[in-house]
A protein has these predicted regions:
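Short non-catalytic regulatory patches outside canonical folded cores
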Residues: 2-63, 83-86
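Polyanionic, low-complexity intrinsically disordered segments
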Residues: 37-53, 64-71, 75, 79-140
């Protein structure tokens, strides 16, 4: 999402207040640049779904897919990244659907014009191959 949203100034992926401070600094160049703070995942996801924020097509996911992507981030990614000792149980039946939604979002975003310009042909092929491998793994 960050690559697809990032504009030439880099402020489009920042928290709103941070982006405002950065734009002001660009104008004045007084002092040190403000500390950059990336917008949270939910904000970036929302921004990527709005045409005004994207070059080319916005991210288009069904409401169920959007819910699954948010759940993957909130319930799985955050709990793994910010580990707190506790018991875990992962709903095996719903996990392939949730991962498919994330793969679909990734596939749509890597075809965005901004991302396309940033990736070499080799990287594009590797990403396409990895997404295909994951999809095939989900079907087996």
């Amino acid at each position: 999402m960050v690559c697809a949203l990032r504009d030439t100034s880099g402020v489009s992926v920042l928290e709103r207040k941070c982006a405002e401070q950065m734009l002001e600094w660009f104008e004045t160049r007084k002092g040190n640049p403000p500390k950059e703070r990336l917008a949270d995942f939910g904000t970036l996801l929302s921004r990527s779904m709005k045409a005004a924020n994207m070059e080319g097509q916005p991210l288009k996911l069904a409401s169920g897919q959007t819910k699954d992507v948010k759940r993957l981030h909130r319930d799985f990614r955050n709990n793994f990244a910010h580990f707190v000792p506790k018991s875990w149980s992962i709903e095996k039946a719903g996990l392939p659907r949730i991962v498919r939604a994330a793969i679909e979002a990734t596939d749509l975003l890597i075809h965005n014009e901004r991302v396309d310009r940033q990736l070499s042909g080799n990287r594009k092929r590797r990403l396409a191959r990895q997404l295909k491998t994951i999809r095939e793994g989900l079907m087996s």
